[in-house]
A protein has these predicted regions:
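Secretory pathway targeting signatures of secreted, lumenal, and periplasmic proteins
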Residues: 36-97, 124
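Structured segments of extracytoplasmic/periplasmic soluble domains
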Residues: 49, 63, 90-98, 120, ...
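Signature of long, low-cysteine stretches enriched in small and polar/charged residues
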Residues: 88-145
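Solvent-exposed, acidic/flexible segments
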Residues: 66, 80-84, 134-137, 156-159, ...
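Surface-exposed amphipathic alpha-helical segments
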Residues: 44-46, 148-182
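Boundary at the C-terminal end of the N-terminal hydrophobic targeting segment
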Residues: 20-22, 26
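Bacterial N-terminal signal peptides
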Residues: 8-19
Length: 182
């Protein structure tokens, strides 16, 4: 009798689909991650995804009705990335026309100095790392952290209708990493 029970359990185990095993479960999502010396806390509504190119140290994505939004994180040694202003100018040059004045804010948090930029207007298409086609009403949210020996750059770009609802999350992510009081 015991043999038949063991045989029955063994056959049942063999009949389990492969999806019943842990290897098929999605990878756990990190709650926090590091880019250089900075710690970022992933917002609950965003997913961690592998960086899509070698310049990115980390990448988060969120599905929206207008497509997928990405928050990208990059690290650049101070000598190779230019000044904070050069990076802000580079982002501004990605727009052929601004519908609102650029909004820049420099703050020194308890962790490091942080400069944020918000741009809204027509985002050029066909640029490396940018959209394939021009986006007429686009918004760029950016932050540059000045850490010891490097800049950590965080950026989210997309249609303004998609960026508007996540703007608070983005700035909260930046404030926490930079040690900036709300």
């Amino acid at each position: 009798m015991t043999r038949f029970l063991r045989l029955g359990f063994s056959l049942t185990f063999l009949a389990l689909p492969i999806s019943a095993f842990p290897e098929s479960l999605p990878a756990p999502q990190p709650i926090a991650f590091r880019v250089g010396s900075l710690r970022f806390d992933r917002p609950d509504s965003w997913r961690w995804v592998p960086p899509s190119d070698s310049l990115r140290a980390a990448q988060l994505e969120k599905k929206t009705p207008n497509g997928t939004l990405l928050i990208t994180f990059s690290r650049f040694p101070n000598a190779s990335s230019g000044s904070v202003q050069a990076n802000l100018d580079r982002w501004t040059a990605q727009f052929s026309k601004l519908s609102l004045p650029a909004k820049t804010q420099a703050t020194t948090g308890s962790v490091c100095p942080v400069t944020t930029l918000r741009l809204q207007g027509t985002l050029k298409g066909g640029l490396p790392g940018g959209p394939a086609k021009e986006i007429v009403d686009a918004t760029l949210l950016g932050a540059i952290f000045q850490t010891e020996g490097e800049l950590v750059v965080v950026k989210c770009t997309g249609p303004s209708t998609s960026i508007g609802p996540i703007e608070k999350e983005f700035y909260s992510l930046i404030a926490i990493a930079g040690g900036i009081s709300p």
